[in-house]
Amino acid sequence: MAVHRGSARAAPASDKVQKNKPAQTSGLEQGSRMARIFGFEWADLSSWQSVVTLLNRPTDPANLAVFRFLFAFLMLLDIPQERGLSSLDRKYLDGLDVCRFPLLDALRPLPLDWMYLVYTIMFLGALGMMLGLWYRLSCMLFLLPYWYVFLLDKTSWNNHSYLYGLLAFQLTFMDANHYWSVDGLLSAQKKNAHVPLWNYTVLRGQIFIVYFIAGVKKLDADWVEGYSMEHLSRHWLFSPFKLVLSEELTSLLVVHWCGLLLDLSAGFLLFFDASRPIGLVFVSYFHCMNSQLFSIGMFPYVMLASSPLFCSAEWPRKLVARCPKRLQELLPAKAAPRPSASCVYKRARAKAGQKPGLRHHLGTVFTLLYLLEQLFLPYSHFLTQGYNNWTNGLYGYSWDMMVHSRSHQHVKITYRDGLTGELGYLNPGVFTQSRRWKDHADMLKQYATCLSLLLPKYNVTEPQIYFDIWVSINDRFQQRLFDPRVDIVQAVWSPFRRTPWVQPLLMDLSPWRTKLQDIKSSLDNHTEVVFIADFPGLHLENFVSEDLGNTSIQLLQGEVTVELVAEQKNQTLREGEKMQLPAGEYHKVYTVSSSPSCYMYIYVNTTEVALEQDLAYLQELKEKVENGSETGPLPPELQPLLEGEVKGGPEPTPLVQTFLRRQRKLQEIERRRNSPLHERFLRFVLRKLYVFRRSFLMTRISLRNLLFGRPSLEQLAQEVTYANLRPFEPVDESSASNTDSSDPHPSEPDSEHVHSEL
């Protein structure tokens, strides 16, 4: 992996030499074959000196410079979007009572205006990196604010954000400004000069690790059996596959198995010359699909930009050489690169030869240690056991992408006054701007500590905080993630020790998933089901909404006692037994068996069913009137079905209003779906334009505040209102936008009625 043939000098033993000298030894033949395949000989690995010489071999800087430019350009696009510059004032507004989740509790956000300055420095650093202007300084200006913002909020961590920081860190130590850079125009030593081979080795090794470790992680049984991304095959991108395969087989064979094979093989396909063309086709198709399937920002495009790194280092020169001569004057140089002090040259290049210096040894050490560290970190969870829950480690550096999908059915936060013993309940997520705290013990501890500091403002003394969080991972039963009996404020947590109040994942119940799918498929369209598993000695307190007029509970395994709170009745259920639950009342389900219990709620939203029937009747009536089969006049309250709501006319009934709202929504969806490609592209551009416009205007306001002081509140309010305008969008679209598309934390959908909070 360390070396690529396209970046190496020609092997000393060529095919021509072998033909002229058939008596050559087999060792030389093997060596030349190895050089053709890997780009180096065994002799290059025979000693430390040879390895240093190999990794500092002079290499064309063109390919590296193209990646530098593309990566930095994508970071310029990323900063207002996924880094959150466009919504920075919503996240870090001064004076907010907000619980935050930094990696280290000592990390705190700066005042809002200073946070805008941090983002401005990061943006200027990315711009300088892209242009190759004051390159090393620009890399630092981007890198330090990036990692500060990254470590400030664990809830926004993901694998690709981590990868961006790693790539920026690597580029900081490289000579990526030796081609196609402003620094090259200002310094003859840097202009079109060689770079050491290790610059490519580190980047190629990083991308190889991302692919390969992601594939190894997908060897997990849940992925291989098709449970991780079970519903992804419903996306329109997989429609061609569903012409010959069922949706279930498309999910298993195309989404899961092909995804596994691609990740395992992508690095190898890109590395070898013979397989690289097919590798480029596969990974390009893969990342283009990902850009449509997931909201993952610039990640697909960064990976697309990294693919040419595996090609020969001089490919940009060959491309420039094929351009018209007039255009070549505006493009980077096509001449051969010059010698550089960063590289080690052999006697053929330097008369007296060259011995590696300290910088060459340091570059080699950095390469080897960095790649070893990247291979170790995804499996270092035995050291950071405090971050292990049902999945291992801090999410974001393990490359276990898309392996685990979660659904949260029920979240309840209970507080107890430490002096009076009074109980109360909090809305899940109160004082937070994220939802990821539900899945991680470290964040839950930070959240409980923060709540214990905020609740005294609301006359709660020495608060104790308890969490009851129910999660399903990869279509298993809904079960508790944390022990609801433990006061998390006083609970022990350490990053290096196992968290005792994390409940184990009930892996023994995994085979039930096939049965659960059969049960779901046997129900009609109006019937819903929720599968629950609970531990012995615990109970679930639940409320059945009045809308759920037909709700029952059925035991699948173990033994439970159901208490109807209002009726003060208890009923014990054994395997296969079921009972009806009254709507509009609380009940408790106690697990009394010695092993975990498994049961399911089966319910019908009778209110919704009745509404659907009424709306279907109105739709049928409207169609009959329009086609002439209904000749009688409509009553006044139903006239809006044909004419719409008329000012001054009779007030439509609530049912008719609901029908009209649905019709308008369906018409808008249909209009957007059938809109021409250029119209969709225009909407996309306008949304992005708003994000960048707001980012620029809010940054300008904050920098003005730092330089000249804050103006009056009235002026600030006017400036922010102007920044929030959408002057480029049609009036109907901009007014219909109830939420800002740049907000990275949209509101969480309501939980199912059957598991609403107390």
Curated annotation (Swiss-Prot):
Per the UniProt record, which residue ranges are transmembrane? 61-81, 114-134, 137-157, 293-313, 362-382
What keywords are annotated for this sequence in UniProt?
Acetylation, Disulfide bond, Endoplasmic reticulum, Lyase, Membrane, Transmembrane, Transmembrane helix
N-acetylalanine: residues bearing it: 2
Q: Where is the composition biased (Basic and acidic residues)?
A: 742-758
Which pairs are disulfide-linked?
99-450
Superkingdom is: Eukaryota
Recite the other comments: The vitamin K-dependent protein substrates of carboxylase have usually a propeptide that binds to a high-affinity site on the carboxylase. CO(2), O(2) and reduced vitamin K are cosubstrates.
Q: What is this protein called?
A: Vitamin K-dependent gamma-carboxylase
Q: Which organism is it from?
A: Rattus norvegicus (Rat)
The upper taxonomy is: Eukaryota, Metazoa, Chordata, Craniata, Vertebrata
